């Protein structure tokens, strides 16, 4: 199933996108935004999956041409953003570019930080910076969207809370 958010409103408008990325359909009868769908995922997911199947079968009368340039980030605002630097070769290159050695511990204890999640930039929008000399770090990342994970959950228990995977950056 492929989901996206149109760049309309503060939290976007949820759409279901066809497998071949050519068609999409708005789903306000299911959820207005991806966050609204996630808030009630156990109920919303089957309806979204059924819509995805109908869209791919050519049975959605309100389907429209899908243009990625019309999209916002899937979750324009998220409740939490924890970034784990698991791609150690990238961390090493970024640190090298600024003349810093990478600590040996990064090879077995990945760096994790809590980043800003209140306003992600749409994929085709310019990245505005006060000074371009600061440099812009752009890399491909994977986002793991979970439901409510209890504190102290083991890795195996946390796996059961994964709801979506997304490409980021």
Regions found by a protein language model. Name each.
Residues 1-8, 19, 35-37, 42-169:
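Active-site microenvironments in enzyme catalytic cores
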Residues 11-16:
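Short N-terminal binding/cap micro-motifs at the start of the first secondary-structure element
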Residues 22-36:
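A short, surface-exposed interaction/processing loop segment used at functional sites
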